[in-house]
């Protein structure tokens, strides 16, 4: 079965919008795990717009399942990741002006730096290192060449497709990328924009997906039905959509 990791960034977004101490991403993570999540994802951005270093260290101490630390290659953030040693480190692109991550890494253009950071993460004791990339063959090949043992496929174009035909076309593109990643020996992860409505088509079409990261859809639903129910609903969606 595909593992479900819940991203708690937007709990921090809500907290920080009022410069409050609540809601707490650490408490939210515990509720997500209690409701059936296989693990927790967070992105420590350079500008600390949602998750803070305090959150990171408490999540590292309290999460019982898998912990996925999303990060750029910025030196301070890499050092923090090496210090807390998550189960998985996912390298992502980052621009201060973006609202959310807008696309995958250009691994082919950044191989020396990505190679150095990947090696450093392994040396620190991180078991899995993943690169977040668009479903493009050249990026899959470069991910393997850099030394990562996982790849996270960017599903944003699939999620944002305006027609059913376009969405199916993007699903097939993701399927080809997943096949290529599997052939290259990479563990396949996926995320960005996956939700209760589009996940079935995604999973029925795209093979080899060991793990998905879903955040915004779950947090938005939690406002209406509560965190426990939102996570349980997503857990059921993932379980029922196996190929």
Curated annotation (Swiss-Prot):
<feature type="site" description="Transition state stabilizer">
    <location>
        <position position="152"/>
    </location>
</feature>
<keyword id="KW-0664">Pyridoxine biosynthesis</keyword>
<dbReference type="InterPro" id="IPR004569">
    <property type="entry name" value="PyrdxlP_synth_PdxJ"/>
</dbReference>
<feature type="active site" description="Proton acceptor">
    <location>
        <position position="43"/>
    </location>
</feature>
<protein>
    <recommendedName>
        <fullName>Pyridoxine 5'-phosphate synthase</fullName>
        <ecNumber>2.6.99.2</ecNumber>
    </recommendedName>
</protein>
<comment type="subunit">
    <text>Homooctamer; tetramer of dimers.</text>
</comment>
<feature type="binding site">
    <location>
        <position position="193"/>
    </location>
    <ligand>
        <name>3-amino-2-oxopropyl phosphate</name>
    </ligand>
</feature>
<feature type="binding site">
    <location>
        <position position="50"/>
    </location>
    <ligand>
        <name>1-deoxy-D-xylulose 5-phosphate</name>
    </ligand>
</feature>
<dbReference type="GO" id="GO:0008615">
    <property type="term" value="P:pyridoxine biosynthetic process"/>
</dbReference>
<feature type="active site" description="Proton donor">
    <location>
        <position position="192"/>
    </location>
</feature>
<feature type="binding site">
    <location>
        <position position="18"/>
    </location>
    <ligand>
        <name>3-amino-2-oxopropyl phosphate</name>
    </ligand>
</feature>
<feature type="active site" description="Proton acceptor">
    <location>
        <position position="70"/>
    </location>
</feature>
<feature type="binding site">
    <location>
        <begin position="215"/>
        <end position="216"/>
    </location>
    <ligand>
        <name>3-amino-2-oxopropyl phosphate</name>
    </ligand>
</feature>
<dbReference type="Pfam" id="PF03740">
    <property type="entry name" value="PdxJ"/>
</dbReference>
<feature type="binding site">
    <location>
        <position position="7"/>
    </location>
    <ligand>
        <name>3-amino-2-oxopropyl phosphate</name>
    </ligand>
</feature>
<keyword id="KW-0963">Cytoplasm</keyword>
<comment type="function">
    <text>Catalyzes the complicated ring closure reaction between the two acyclic compounds 1-deoxy-D-xylulose-5-phosphate (DXP) and 3-amino-2-oxopropyl phosphate (1-amino-acetone-3-phosphate or AAP) to form pyridoxine 5'-phosphate (PNP) and inorganic phosphate.</text>
</comment>
<comment type="pathway">
    <text>Cofactor biosynthesis; pyridoxine 5'-phosphate biosynthesis; pyridoxine 5'-phosphate from D-erythrose 4-phosphate: step 5/5.</text>
</comment>
<comment type="similarity">
    <text>Belongs to the PNP synthase family.</text>
</comment>
<feature type="binding site">
    <location>
        <begin position="9"/>
        <end position="10"/>
    </location>
    <ligand>
        <name>1-deoxy-D-xylulose 5-phosphate</name>
    </ligand>
</feature>
<dbReference type="GO" id="GO:0005829">
    <property type="term" value="C:cytosol"/>
</dbReference>
<feature type="binding site">
    <location>
        <position position="45"/>
    </location>
    <ligand>
        <name>1-deoxy-D-xylulose 5-phosphate</name>
    </ligand>
</feature>
<dbReference type="GO" id="GO:0033856">
    <property type="term" value="F:pyridoxine 5'-phosphate synthase activity"/>
</dbReference>
<dbReference type="InterPro" id="IPR013785">
    <property type="entry name" value="Aldolase_TIM"/>
</dbReference>
<dbReference type="InterPro" id="IPR036130">
    <property type="entry name" value="Pyridoxine-5'_phos_synth"/>
</dbReference>
<feature type="binding site">
    <location>
        <position position="100"/>
    </location>
    <ligand>
        <name>1-deoxy-D-xylulose 5-phosphate</name>
    </ligand>
</feature>
<keyword id="KW-0808">Transferase</keyword>
């Amino acid at each position: 079965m595909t593992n479900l990791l819940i991203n708690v960034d937007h709990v921090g977004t809500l907290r920080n919008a009022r410069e409050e101490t609540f809601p707490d991403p650490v408490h939210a993570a515990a509720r997500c795990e209690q409701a059936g999540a296989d693990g927790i994802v967070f992105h420590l951005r350079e500008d600390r717009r949602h998750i803070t270093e305090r959150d990171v260290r408490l999540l590292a101490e309290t999460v019982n399942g898998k912990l996925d630390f999303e990060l750029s290659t910025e030196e301070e953030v890499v050092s923090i990741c090496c210090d807390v040693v998550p189960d998985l480190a996912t390298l992502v692109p980052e621009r201060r002006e973006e609202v959310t991550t807008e696309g995958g890494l250009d691994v082919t253009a950044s191989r020396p730096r990505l190679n150095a950071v990947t090696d450093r993460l392994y040396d620190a004791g991180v078991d899995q290192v993943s690169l977040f990339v668009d479903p493009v063959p050249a990026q899959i090949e470069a991910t393997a060449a850099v030394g990562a043992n996982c790849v996270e496929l960017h599903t944003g174009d699939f999620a944002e497709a305006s027609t059913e035909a376009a969405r199916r076309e993007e699903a097939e593109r993701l399927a080809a990328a997943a096949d290529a990643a599997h052939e290259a020996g990479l563990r396949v992860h996926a995320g960005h924009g996956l939700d209760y409505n589009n996940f079935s088509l995604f999973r029925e079409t795209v093979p080899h997906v060991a793990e998905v990261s879903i955040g915004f859809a779950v947090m938005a639903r939690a406002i209406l039905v509560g965190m426990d129910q939102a996570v349980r609903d997503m857990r059921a969606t993932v379980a029922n959509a196996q190929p």
